[in-house]
A protein has these predicted regions:
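Active-site environment of divalent metal-dependent phosphoester hydrolases
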Residues: 24-26, 56-59, 81-92, 140-143, ...
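Structural recognition of the beta-strand scaffold that forms the well-ordered cores
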Residues: 14-17, 46-51, 56, 78-83, ...
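Extended active-site neighborhood of metal-dependent phosphoesterases/phosphodiesterases
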Residues: 2-7, 65-170, 263-268
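Soluble or luminal CAZymes and related metallo-dependent hydrolases
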Residues: 28-32, 60, 64, 110, ...
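His/acidic metal-ligating clusters that form di-metal
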Residues: 43-47, 131-133, 145-233
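N-terminal active-site segment of His-dependent metallophosphoesterases
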Residues: 1-67
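Metal-dependent catalytic neighborhoods of phosphoester/phosphodiester hydrolases
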Residues: 28, 52-71, 88-106, 189, ...
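Binuclear metal-dependent phosphoesterase catalytic core
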Residues: 2-5, 9, 18, 115-126, ...
Length: 294
């Protein structure tokens, strides 16, 4: 477990998820910072998660990363990262992230190291009321999709979920889960809002270890948020669980003018079984989406 966050005096906690800056040039890092600034001013999140694919060749410099996250640092907001297919785990890069203030990345002993659970405390007591899972979803393409979660990762998630449940007197702790590569099940969800201007890259069906079924069984994760697809910002629902895309931040790599922005997830401790999500754009052509409640 990591340092714990806290709901505000009204019981609210807001998460901003952005993804895929995939910057290669300094002007793109500055552009990503400008778009992040827009989102932070607009949404005032308590926590920011950057959901993979920071730089195409996984060669991020401390200088460029500092440009990108300066708006977060200035506001003293806690933040973390998730590995994407373009940035498989490198200890030296994770160590660089940790040199910046308020970074909550950690390493779990696992086949792929960067998985973590960040608890969020209630406003008035030392009790976990919400949790944020960050998961490594693999970097290799196999036949019909990406490698996705491993069995060891799934076992870790189950154990962590059960630990939180035990601490909460046998009641599951409402949670969100972020990973870069979408689960295979996105093709089956009912799309509620958003644009989808490319094929939905996802976990290989052959390598699917049953992540979605495990999440249904645990009953704690209400929403999964993905990256990877730069021209998709949809939100959908399957079997009572929301699955949404973060869209893209910056013009790094391929992009369009409709999915530039980030996904917001809101929780309130006074309604502990509910989450609210919507997508927030940074360009005039990237239209905000209506809120979805589950």
């Amino acid at each position: 477990m990591l340092q714990k966050l806290k709901c505000n005096k009204n019981g609210d906690f807001t998460v901003l998820v952005v993804a895929d800056p995939q910057c290669e040039k300094e002007f793109q890092w500055k552009e990503a910072a400008d778009e992040l600034e827009i989102l932070l001013k607009k949404e005032e999140p308590d926590f920011v998660l950057i959901n993979g694919d920071m730089e195409t060749n996984n060669l991020i410099t401390k200088e460029n990363w500092g440009i990108f996250i300066q708006p977060i640092i200035e506001r003293k907001i806690f933040w973390s990262t998730v590995n994407g297919n373009h940035d498989p785990f490198k200890k030296e890069i994770n160590d660089m992230y940790l040199e910046f203030d308020k970074c909550l990345n950690t390493i779990i002993e696992n086949e792929r190291p960067l998985n973590y659970c960040i608890p969020v405390l209630g406003s008035k007591e030392e009790k976990t009321v919400f949790a944020i899972y960050g998961m490594d979803s693999g970097d290799a393409f196999i036949d019909d999709g990406w490698t996705g979660y491993t069995k060891k990762q799934l076992e870790w998630y189950r154990n962590c979920s059960e630990e939180l449940k035990t601490e909460n007197n046998g009641v599951s702790v409402t949670s969100m889960m972020c990973c870069h590569i979408p689960l295979q099940e996105v093709v089956s969800m009912e799309i509620l809002h958003g644009v989808c201007n490319e094929n939905m890259g996802r976990t290989s069906k052959a390598l699917n270890v049953g992540t979605f079924e495990a999440i249904k069984e645990q009953g704690d994760v209400k929403i999964l948020v993905f990256g990877h697809s730069h021209k998709i910002n949809v939100i959908g629902k399957l079997d009572g669980i929301l699955m949404g895309y973060a869209g893209k931040i910056s013009s790094g790599s391929y992009h369009d003018e409709f999915s530039r922005g980030g996904r917001i997830v809101k929780f309130n401790e006074n309604e502990p079984n509910k989450v609210v999500t919507y997508w927030s754009g940074v360009l005039p052509t990237s239209k905000d989406q209506p809120a979805v409640v589950i």
